[in-house]
Amino acid sequence: VSSPLSVADFDYALPPELIAQHPSPERGGSRLLHLDTQGRLHDRMFADLAGQLRANDLLVFNDTRVIKARLAGHKASGGKVEVLVERIVEADRALAHVRASKSPGPGTVLRLADRFDVTVLGRAGALFDLRFPGDVLDLLQAHGATPLPPYITHAAETEDDERYQTVYARAPGAVAAPTAGLHFDEAMMQRLEDVGVARAFVTLHVGAGTFKPVQVEKLADHVMHAEWYTVPQATADAVARAHAAGGRVIAVGTTSARALESAAAQLQGDGQAQPQTPQTPQPPQALRAAQGDTQLFITPGYRFQVLDGLVTNFHLPQSTLLMMISAMAGMDPIRRAYAHAVAERYRFFSYGDAMLIESPVAPALASSHSAAPGPAAV
């Protein structure tokens, strides 16, 4: 009997100098580590991605836009505060992380950016409910800073305002970029179109929880952070079309993957990950439009419903994202891939290089088309 998975199963040693502090000079100039259905590794360039895809494949992108969610300020007492907006709930109200020497209580007024005051209305779990003196998005755009990840050590610069945003970002609301998408420029989008690769979009507003390591030992005890997502009907239809034509559905980023799999989980009626036990085979249902908060936590043993593959960056040790890619490719293939990436000095995390992971098994909703060739990785 295998023992339950623990966080230690997803640890690896990373020399700090491999954490990319700046993007590569060109968007498409990164390297691409390709893990195929047989568990074999291929060192490629990201510019070669189109050569690994074929007509009728579908790439699904997350069109969320990073907001300038970070604001510095002070309390009336003069104490410093740092605010990171996590979610805009009304035009003039937001839930935010607040860093201060002492937690501000309801009614506290915070002076932000030396320009405007926000009022603390109360708490919502770890977040603070803040009332802004006008449109939150407008105020952030004018006075906020791009919220770079904690492992990027320089303050946000003009370069980051552009490069920590995908070229197709449309729906404002994320506090972290869907980083797999940062490698795509207009020329790459055109090349993919030229080889007959279809594209579709989902929206998932990435929260700051994406950087949080799992803080319990046993995965079963972890409470996954919630993120808001939407999968439009046009995207659900594109998934069905791709699978019907024998194409593969490949998510660009773990956030796109989470949105698609969350929509599939809603077909089962609960919007959560399905129990990780063999289930009675059910006739495949077509994916439908879906939206809402998702707390889907994908770990090894999960059967993907929609995805045949994933384009993704390298993830932090012990992170839920490393667990998700291990669910797709198998734990050993991912361990080998990461050891190879460290040895070959790939660049890691948000501004780093990418992986193309091809799933060794076909997704459940595509059981009308044949499984990907090759043995399943375990």
Label every PLM stretch briefly.
Residues V1-V378:
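Surface-exposed, charge/polar-rich loops and edge strands
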